């Protein structure tokens, strides 16, 4: 598989290393200092792109891939205010892309567990819920895309919660996301339901970035044969 990397930070470099080790060819890596080289890539020399760039570059990157007919797996977060525009563009151009706030298989299982627990807790009185995340200090978005996905999974089942807020809150209708940035943490997420008599907690801890990178490569392998706007659920159902 011929992979074009859009963004070449820590995740891009790790994907490069792992993909090459798996026998794939990384045909190029595009970053802020060599963006003019993007024009040399097209669907004849590139099978799929993986985007771990910056929020301000993601939309342009996705549209470029769609224009070139190159499927793109997008792990960049912080650009979702423009997702509806990108979705419309993809449909109009008959393109292919998949956005995921997290490509780790373990985290996506955690997403499902979170939704199931929220459904179980929806009829339980006396419990309040909050979420907590810890990431490395170079993590630019707060809360993380993963935390937002977890919060949305809770909100769809708990009718007494109306929105998430990225702070401690005394408003019973708000779901608190507490964000901490501590090196060298790759990523920890906790969901805590607490009452006067007990507490129920679920937690996911990433020991390294490798799970995210391996997941992105696996998704890219699958996505190159797909068409349209895809989700991680579509990929997981294919396993």
Segments from the language model and where they lie:
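C-terminal substrate-binding/catalytic lobe of Rossmann-fold NAD(P)-dependent oxidoreductases
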Residues: 2, 6, 10-43, 123-239
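Rossmann-fold NAD(P) dinucleotide-binding segment
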Residues: 41-42, 48, 55-75, 84-86
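Rossmann-fold dehydrogenase core element
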Residues: 71, 86-104, 121, 127, ...
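Rossmann-fold NAD(P)-binding glycine/threonine-rich loop
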Residues: 63, 76-97, 108, 113-117
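Short hydrophobic/aromatic-enriched beta-strand-loop microsegments
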Residues: 26-28, 69-76, 96-98
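Amphipathic, non-transmembrane alpha-helical secondary structure
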Residues: 39-40, 59, 63-67, 111, ...
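Short, acidic/turn-prone active-site loops that include or flank metal/cofactor-
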Residues: 31-35, 76-80, 103
